[in-house]
């Protein structure tokens, strides 16, 4: 593939800069001051490559390449079937042989070379007869157990291919008898109950439907010794469970039905209409019924009814696309719900992709961000109703903002950011939230039915140009500059100014015709009224509009005007007392108006927008059955309307935006162990000043020339490179590297494996003084090290590096690098002024033209971003500037090399290279800084974000856990559902809050023991193209992503390898079920497979970061944090595998390899669905009214996928919506600025109260049930199971020492869970049940929880518990009094249930109050120290 000169120069320039950095790093490393003499991050242009292993016949490979290139793999697979059966690859003998070869080969193509599916998964292919029916021939596919590893998609495709082969061979359908059908119904249920839980357990009706309609027989050999009751069925060779056939039917055809329909349409295979109906019924939530199963004695009679177009569309919409409330079932305290599912007034769907949206990102008007109290900021994450589950928010100014009602009753349309700031404190109600621009590609990616498009400017301009062409035969194109000749001709016909017409066509989103001109266009061109002047007519019932019409006709004072014979209203004044209920109709119309004194005033242009559709009141508006308001208007009025408010989408706030330096917890400046000598702050300088000696596990080195021993790699006396000292853990004998290697790292005396470290005493004062002298840094306040090294080598960093970090105020991560984390946000185009870069500088960086091909001369021109260029937040710029100064100091003072960055301000970093690394990934990607924005996000090309890879397991991987004290195995998919509070970050879903008491079994490699540990988070990520399947000698197996860390036993120790580095014969550990001892088992077979599902899963285990999966196989989890960037040279100089934690799968959150040249074909396939057009065609908008599937329109709108393999995949991408500034909007979500939870929840509910599309009482109920109550109950449980902690050395105890002092250091012992931590949300919860209409049951749960907390502390610490005086206004006490007879007032509880408790007071009976006071006097509050020191 030959790239244009400019793009080739770009990649060459990147490689030159990378090579330059590597050369500098090599010179530095060659000095021997680091653990390795080489740079430890290799370059790679392709991480693993594509793996294709096709199955015969001989000579087919070249033909497949030709056909795939010409037709794509789906059609190529069918063409190959044709050619195999036609004998083009030789005579195979029988029909059965042809069928078997064709099925296996086609399936191998469709699964891109999956070996297990076409070979092991299909045991055989046979041609059999329907002997119980008409004796016709049919095709039978025999599936084996290993078909499971091929995944549901491959399983389903094999059935599809089998049907195509059947047709090609001229065979009849499989015609199952009732016995065949009921046998499969029994098998599916029996398998699910007795053998293994199916990922998808179909109902008996679904199994019957599939069995009756699938044209081939899905059968197989016996896989499990479980007998069935439907026995001796003709044509079925076994009376035991056929596991392979069950999996193909349930987890293949039925579970993957939606995906299979895609392939059916793409491949043009007929006879599968039943499956499309099945998918549609499932989407609507309908029960599956067999044909003819519902009896009817009454013949249906079709009656013609007069039904309006929009009424009919609404009915169809409601019946086919139900609101999806899954996102709103959990609401976190402090994170608002912005709209109920599909609620009118929520986010208005606007199809398109702005230059900063698409790829799971929504563009919204920054005015919306302001008016939801800035809970939304640039980069804030949303949980969404559709098309996907989550999205990031970015600003788009060319779409509509909110429409709000002010406290004085006026209604204002707020499209302008400055106006939003001005009126924010006057808003009483948000009537309409505003637009959310969502890309067509996101609907394709999620295979979501297209919702009816809301009428908008980009649709109107297409109808405008179409009408011009049809009526006047003038062909003008929207969103571009048209020829002067065509413009002049059209301007004459339309009687408009040519310059205005030019701007209207070039930028219809910003250029609005005056209302009288819009009416003129509608009249002469016969097009609907411009959407800007179209109100939300269908949000108001026709009966309400009829009442409004009468008020206007009888009481309104109207100022009329005229334009070219067109009558239009300029101003309307309506007495407020006459409007009454109709005032609400004006508000719901979204009509801007003012309330002045006793009048409602509608000014220009909105007076015309109101009266023109009503025929200027010249015809009577009357409500009509089965008609919407717009239907009635369109039947009576000359100027027609389109509905601008059909489709609405719900959303709630997810995680707030992030842009912050990465720090370890607690922060570290140098990876150097100081033990207890540095105190709780691990301050090496403090330990040195106090002359302390640190006793730590550390690697030491010995000079072969003068014998000096110390942690430095270079001898401070003679400058010689030292040798590592290996130590015998038994006899403590020491051997330098040269000697140890001769003994094969085994002690010759004890025959024990040597260790590269030992517990030794070091003097921080000597080491620090020498380091300070070396780099001439003396004036630092602190130097923070680590308590102990977690790596297998225990090699410390040179102290000089820590001193230089401290001097520059930067912090190190576990691998030696310095990182900055940020929320990912996509961008494909930018303006120079937005990123603070001059045109001259951009030209130096290779940006010579704007995206339309014009020479770059202005900072306001729009420029297309190159794929590996990134735009960082200013916060990142400030921090990376410090990092650059650190690197320069390091080069100059430590390595004696010239400074590299020479940066004095962050703009000096423009043009320099970084490494981008995502969580749960292995490889970094090289990027180039081209600018900075004032927003807490990391803007980069969607390709760049998609290039960060993820490592996880398939969802059916079983993992050993302990739930509520009971050991059990669950699938990772099930584990994910046991956690709450899902958020979306960097293209993965993360949950951190367990619903139950759950721990995971982990493996301690040092001691060879199985241990229990906490789960920090569970992760769900989009599946990669391939997985690797490992089959072990004892028959067990597991699958994982190709870059996943795998724990391997090699040369007497545990090492971590990436999955693709593991070889057959490598040793993997399995835990013996009975003895819990580790067994060493060899890898027998390795193969590449397709992922069984669209997602893969993993978790972070807290301590050893290993997990036990499937048949007790020990392996690493995946690991990681936020997406991060690091300066390339910092990583090359300071990263070392010797620093990486030995027990951590976290090695994969390290730049073990970097991709230097991005190939869009090999990044996350989600980006392949991103649309790249300037506007969506008219055909698209019209198709949405038919509720079409997005796959029906993939040929209409160009996507990245259409350019893969062509030079154009790198450039020439377009967008539909511009924005004035990619950083316009709140910089930080209010959520991050508020204090305690009660304050956050109050503000959250304030927003809910104001938004018309939200029921605040329902929000309060959901917050309680999904967040506060589970937290309160969980914290209560945690208190009873907590550990105790030493405040000095942080040692933890399951049970505290009797004297209350740490036996290690004598420090105080404290609780790890306090009473305050347990009840921190109790006040908030009681506020919610008091002020909002929540269910009685929920109120009582809160009160019971409070009682449990009080009861616990009274029982456990009776002397320390301070009993509060009873507060008669406390809701829980009122309920208790009601139940116990303390209050004789009837109906009190019911009053509370209905929210009537505000301001009511009732005195406690005097006798009871006195008793409580006496009880409280006997109790006192004491400290924990006093408690432990009691005699």
Curated annotation (Swiss-Prot):
Quaternary state and partners of this protein? Heterodimer of a large subunit and a small subunit.
Q: What does this protein do?
A: Possesses two activities: a DNA synthesis (polymerase) and an exonucleolytic activity that degrades single-stranded DNA in the 3'- to 5'-direction. Has a template-primer preference which is characteristic of a replicative DNA polymerase.
Q: What species does this protein belong to?
A: Pyrococcus horikoshii (strain ATCC 700860 / DSM 12428 / JCM 9974 / NBRC 100139 / OT-3)
Q: Which family does it belong to?
A: Belongs to the archaeal DNA polymerase II family.
Upper taxonomic lineage: Archaea, Methanobacteriati, Methanobacteriota, Thermococci, Thermococcales
Q: Which InterPro entries match?
A: Hint_dom_C, Hint_dom_N, Hint_dom_sf, HNH_nuc, Intein_C, Intein_N, PolC_DP2, PolC_DP2_cat_dom
Q: Does the keyword Hydrolase apply?
A: yes
Report which gene this protein is encoded by.
polC
Q: Which GO terms describe its biological process?
A: DNA catabolic process; DNA-templated DNA replication; intein-mediated protein splicing
| Keywords per UniProt | Autocatalytic cleavage, DNA replication, DNA-binding, DNA-directed DNA polymerase, Exonuclease, Hydrolase, Multifunctional enzyme, Nuclease, Nucleotidyltransferase, Protein splicing, Transferase
Alphabetical list of NCBIfam families matching this protein: intein_Nterm, polC, PRK04023.1, PRK14714.1, PRK14715.1
Cross-referenced Pfam families, in alphabetical order? Intein_splicing, PolC_DP2_cat, PolC_DP2_central, PolC_DP2_N
Which modifications occur after translation, per UniProt? This protein undergoes a protein self splicing that involves a post-translational excision of the intervening region (intein) followed by peptide ligation.
Give the region (Disordered) as residue ranges. 1388-1431
By its UniProt entry, which SMART domains does this protein fall under? HintC, HintN
List all Basic and acidic residues biased stretches: 1399-1415
> Which EC number applies?
2.7.7.7, 3.1.11.1
What would be an example GO MF term here? single-stranded DNA 3'-5' DNA exonuclease activity
User: Can you say what this protein is called?
Assistant: DNA polymerase II large subunit
List the HAMAP family: DNApol_II_L_arch (MF_00324)
Catalytic reactions on record:
DNA(n) + a 2'-deoxyribonucleoside 5'-triphosphate = DNA(n+1) + diphosphate; Exonucleolytic cleavage in the 3'- to 5'-direction to yield nucleoside 5'-phosphates
The answer to keyword DNA-binding applying to this record is yes
Q: Which PROSITE patterns match?
A: INTEIN_C_TER (PS50818), INTEIN_N_TER (PS50817)
Do you know which Gene3D superfamilies this protein is assigned to? Hedgehog/Intein (Hint) domain
């Amino acid at each position: 593939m030959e790239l244009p000169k400019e793009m080739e120069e770009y990649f060459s320039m990147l490689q030159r800069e990378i090579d330059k950095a590597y050369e500098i790093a090599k010179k530095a490393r060659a000095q021997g001051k680091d653990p390795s003499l080489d740079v430890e991050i290799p370059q790679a242009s392709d991480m693993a490559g594509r793996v294709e292993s096709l199955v015969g016949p001989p000579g087919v490979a070249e033909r497949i390449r030709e056909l795939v290139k010409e037709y794509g793999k789906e059609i190529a697979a069918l063409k190959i079937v044709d050619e195999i059966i036609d004998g083009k690859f030789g005579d195979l003998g029988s029909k059965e042989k042809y069928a078997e070869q064709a099925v296996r080969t086609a399936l191998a193509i469709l699964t891109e070379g999956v070996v297990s599916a076409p070979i092991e998964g299909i045991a055989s292919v046979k041609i059999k007869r329907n002997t119980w029916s008409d004796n016709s021939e049919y095709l039978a596919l025999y599936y084996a157990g290993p078909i499971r590893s091929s995944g549901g998609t491959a399983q389903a495709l094999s059935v599809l291919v089998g049907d195509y082969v059947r047709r090609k061979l001229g065979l009849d359908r499989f015609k199952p008898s009732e016995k065949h059908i009921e046998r499969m119904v029994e098998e599916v249920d029996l398998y699910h109950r007795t053998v293994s839980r199916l990922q998808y357990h179909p109902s008996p009706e679904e199994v019957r439907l599939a069995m009756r309609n699938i044209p081939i027989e899905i059968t197989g050999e016996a896989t499990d010794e479980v007998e069935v009751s439907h026995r001796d069925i003709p044509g079925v060779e076994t009376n035991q469970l056929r596991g392979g056939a069950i999996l193909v039917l349930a987890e293949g055809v039925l579970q993957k039905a939606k995906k299979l329909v895609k392939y059916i349409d793409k491949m043009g295979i007929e006879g599968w209409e039943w499956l499309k109906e099945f998918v549609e019924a499932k989407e609507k939530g309908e029960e599956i019924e067999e044909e003819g199963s519902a009896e009817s004695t009454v013949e249906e009679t079709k009656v013609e009814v007069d039904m309006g177009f929009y009424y009919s569309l609404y009915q169809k919409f409601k019946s086919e696309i139900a609101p999806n409330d899954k996102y709103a079932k959990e609401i976190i305290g402090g994170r608002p719900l912005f709209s109920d599912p599909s609620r009118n007034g929520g986010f208005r769907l606007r199809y398109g992709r702005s230059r900063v949206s698409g790829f799971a990102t929504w563009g919204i008007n920054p005015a919306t961000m302001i008016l939801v109290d800035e809970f939304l900021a640039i980069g804030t994450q949303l949980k969404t109703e559709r098309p996907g589950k989550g999205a990031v928010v970015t600003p788009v100014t060319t779409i509509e903002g909110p429409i709000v009602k002010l406290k004085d009753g006026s209604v204002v349309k707020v499209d302008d950011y400055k106006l939003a700031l001005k009126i924010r404190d006057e808003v009483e109600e948000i009537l309409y939230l505003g637009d959310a621009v969502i890309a067509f590609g996101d609907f394709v990616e999620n295979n979501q039915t297209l919702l009816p498009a809301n009428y908008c400017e980009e649709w109107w301009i297409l109808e405008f140009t179409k009408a011009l062409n049809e009526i006047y035969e003038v062909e003008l194109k929207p969103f571009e500059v048209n020829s002067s000749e065509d413009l002049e001709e059209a301007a004459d016909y339309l009687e408009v100014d040519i310059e205005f017409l030019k701007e209207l066509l070039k930028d219809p989103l910003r250029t609005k015709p005056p209302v009288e001109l819009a009416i003129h266009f509608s009249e002469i061109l016969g097009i609907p009224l411009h959407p800007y002047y179209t109100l939300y007519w269908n949000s108001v019932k026709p009966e309400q509009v009829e009442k409004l019409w009468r008020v206007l006709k009888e009481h309104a004072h109207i100022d009329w005007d005229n334009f070219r014979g067109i009558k239009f209203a300029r101003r309307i004044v309506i007495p407020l007392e006459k409007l009454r209920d109709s005032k609400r109709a004006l508000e719901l119309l979204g009509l801007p108006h003012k309330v002045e004194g006793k009048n409602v005033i509608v000014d220009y242009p909105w007076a015309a927008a109101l009266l023109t559709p009503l025929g200027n009141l010249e015809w009577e508006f009357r409500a009509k059955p089965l008609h919407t308001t717009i239907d009635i208007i369109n039947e009576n009025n000359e100027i027609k309307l389109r509905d601008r408010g059909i489709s609405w989408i719900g959303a709630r706030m997810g995680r707030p935006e992030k842009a912050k330096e990465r720090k370890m917890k607690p922060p570290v400046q140098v990876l150097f162990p100081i033990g207890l000598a540095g105190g709780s702050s691990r301050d090496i300088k403090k330990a040195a000043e106090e002359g302390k000696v640190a006793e730590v596990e550390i690697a030491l080195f010995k000079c072969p020339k003068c014998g000096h021993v110390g942690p430095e790699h270079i001898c401070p006396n003679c400058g010689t490179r030292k040798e590592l000292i290996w130590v015998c853990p038994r006899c403590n004998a020491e051997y330098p590297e040269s000697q140890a290697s001769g003994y094969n790292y085994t002690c010759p005396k004890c025959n024990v494996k040597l260790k590269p470290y030992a517990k030794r005493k070091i003097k921080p004062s000597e080491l620090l003084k020498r380091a300070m002298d070396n780099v001439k840094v003396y004036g630092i306040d602190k130097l923070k090290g680590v308590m102990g090294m977690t790596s297998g080598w225990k090699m410390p960093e040179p102290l000089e590096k820590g001193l230089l970090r401290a001097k520059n105020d930067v912090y190190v991560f576990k691998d030696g690098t310095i990182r900055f984390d940020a929320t990912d946000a996509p961008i494909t185009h930018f303006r120079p002024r937005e990123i603070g870069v001059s045109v001259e500088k951009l030209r130096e960086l290779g940006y010579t033209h704007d995206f339309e091909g014009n020479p770059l001369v202005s900072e306001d021109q729009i420029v297309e971003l190159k794929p590996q260029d990134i735009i960082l937040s200013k916060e990142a710029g400030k921090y990376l500037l410090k990092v650059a100064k650190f690197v320069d100091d390091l080069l100059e003072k430590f390595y004696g090399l010239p400074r590299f960055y020479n940066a004095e301000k962050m703009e000096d970093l423009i043009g320099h290279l970084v490494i981008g690394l995502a969580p749960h990934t292995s490889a970094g990607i090289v990027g180039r800084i081209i600018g900075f924005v004032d927003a807490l996000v990391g803007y980069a090309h969607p390709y760049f974000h998609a290039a960060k890879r993820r490592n996880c397991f398939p969802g059916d991987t079983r993992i050993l856990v302990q739930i509520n004290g009971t050991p059990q195995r669950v699938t990772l998919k099930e584990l994910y559902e046991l956690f709450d509070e899902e958020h979306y970050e960097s293209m993965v879903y993360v949950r951190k809050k367990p619903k139950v008491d759950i721990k995971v079994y982990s493996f301690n490699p040092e001691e060879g023991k199985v241990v229990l540990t906490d789960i920090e988070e569970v992760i769900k990520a989009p599946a990669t193209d391939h997985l690797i399947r490992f089959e072990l000698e004892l028959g067990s197996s597991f699958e994982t992503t190709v870059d996943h860390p795998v724990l391997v036993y090699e040369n007497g120790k545990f090492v971590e390898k990436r999955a693709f580095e593991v070889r057959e014969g490598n040793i993997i550990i399995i835990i013996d079920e009975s003895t819990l001892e580790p067994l060493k088992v060899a890898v027998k077979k390795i193969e590449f497979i397709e992922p069984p599902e669209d997602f893969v899963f993993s978790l972070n285990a807290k301590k050893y970061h290993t997990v036990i999966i499937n048949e007790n196989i020990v392996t690493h989890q995946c690991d990681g944090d936020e997406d991060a960037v690091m300066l390339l040279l910092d990583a090359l100089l300071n990263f070392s595998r010797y620093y990486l934690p030995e027990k951590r799968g976290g090695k994969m959150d390290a730049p073990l390899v970097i991709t230097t040249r991005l190939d869009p074909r090999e990044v996350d396939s989600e980006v392949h669905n991103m649309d790249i057009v300037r506007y969506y065609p008219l055909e698209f908008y019209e198709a949405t009214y038919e509720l079409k599937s997005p796959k029906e329109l993939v040929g209409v709108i160009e996507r990245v996928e259409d350019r893969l393999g062509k030079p154009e995949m790198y450039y020439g991408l377009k967008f539909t919506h511009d924005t004035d500034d990619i950083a316009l909007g709140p910089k930080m979500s209010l959520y991050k600025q508020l204090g305690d939870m009660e304050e956050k929840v109050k503000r959250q509910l304030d927003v809910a109260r104001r938004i018309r599309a939200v029921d605040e009482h329902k929000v309060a109920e959901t917050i309680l049930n999904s967040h506060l109550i589970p937290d309160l109950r969980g914290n209560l449980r945690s208190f009873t199971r907590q550990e105790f902690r030493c405040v000095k050395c942080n040692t933890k105890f399951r049970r505290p020492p009797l004297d209350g002092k740490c036996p290690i250091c004598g420090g105080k012992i404290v609780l790890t869970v306090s009473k305050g931590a347990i009840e921190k949300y109790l006040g908030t919860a009681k506020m919610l049940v008091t002020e909002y209409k929540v269910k009685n049951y929920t109120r009582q749960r809160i009160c019971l929880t409070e009682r449990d907390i009080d009861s616990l502390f009274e029982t456990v610490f009776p002397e320390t518990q301070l009993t509060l005086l009873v507060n008669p206004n406390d809701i829980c006490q009122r309920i208790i009094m009601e139940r116990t007879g303390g209050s004789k007032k009837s109906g009190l509880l019911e009053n509370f249930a209905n929210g009537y408790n505000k301001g009511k007071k009732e005195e406690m009976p005097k006798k009871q109050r006195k008793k409580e006071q006496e009880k409280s006097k006997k109790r006192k509050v004491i400290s924990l120290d006093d408690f432990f020191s009691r005699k």
